[in-house]
């Protein structure tokens, strides 16, 4: 049996998080990258939003909240609560 390849496809894919801000307010790394604790970007290091609409890497804000007695947004100092996906 003889197989002939008539064409070769070169594919490229890209992804990015749908975030209005370019970088995390805590670690200052881009959201399309990853936080300083992660080795590769992706679903293990997603951005999360507070009700104040500030976004941070999930690992960064969790570390911030665990290190601070007051549960406040690092940007505006309002009480930190995770924004729900529900409307």
Swiss-Prot record:
Any one biological process term the GO annotation gives: ubiquitin-dependent protein catabolic process
Function per UniProt: Component of the anaphase promoting complex/cyclosome (APC/C), a cell cycle-regulated E3 ubiquitin-protein ligase complex that controls progression through mitosis and the G1 phase of the cell cycle.
Molecular functions (GO terms): cullin family protein binding; ubiquitin protein ligase activity; ubiquitin-protein transferase activity; zinc ion binding
Oligomeric form and interacting partners: The APC/C is composed of at least 13 subunits that stay tightly associated throughout the cell cycle: anapc1, anapc2, anapc3, anapc4, anapc5, anapc6, anapc7, anapc8, anapc10, anapc11, cdc20, cdc26 and cdh1.
Any GO CC annotation of this UniProt entry: anaphase-promoting complex
Main location: nucleus
Zinc finger (RING-type): 35-77
Statement: the UniProt record of this protein carries the keyword Zinc: yes
Pfam family, one: zf-ANAPC11
Record keywords, A-Z: Cell cycle, Cell division, Metal-binding, Mitosis, Nucleus, Ubl conjugation pathway, Zinc, Zinc-finger
Family, as annotated: Belongs to the RING-box family.
Domain of life per record: Eukaryota
Compartment(s) of residence: Nucleus
Gene3D superfamilies to which the protein is assigned, alphabetical: Zinc/RING finger domain, C3HC4 (zinc finger) (3.30.40.10)
Pathway: Protein modification; protein ubiquitination
UniProt keyword Transcription present: no
Name of the protein in its database record: Anaphase-promoting complex subunit 11
Entry-linked InterPro entries: RING-box_E3_Ubiquitin_Ligase, RING-H2_APC11, Znf_RING, Znf_RING/FYVE/PHD
């Amino acid at each position: 049996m003889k197989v002939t390849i008539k064409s070769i496809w070169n594919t490229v894919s890209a992804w990015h998080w749908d975030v209005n801000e370019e970088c995390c307010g805590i670690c200052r790394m881009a959201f399309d990258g990853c936080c300083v604790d992660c080795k590769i970007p992706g679903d293990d290091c997603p951005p999360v939003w507070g009700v104040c609409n500030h976004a941070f890497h999930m690992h960064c804000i969790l570390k911030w909240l665990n290190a601070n007695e007051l549960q406040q947004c690092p940007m505006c100092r309002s009480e930190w609560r995770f924004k729900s996906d529900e409307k």
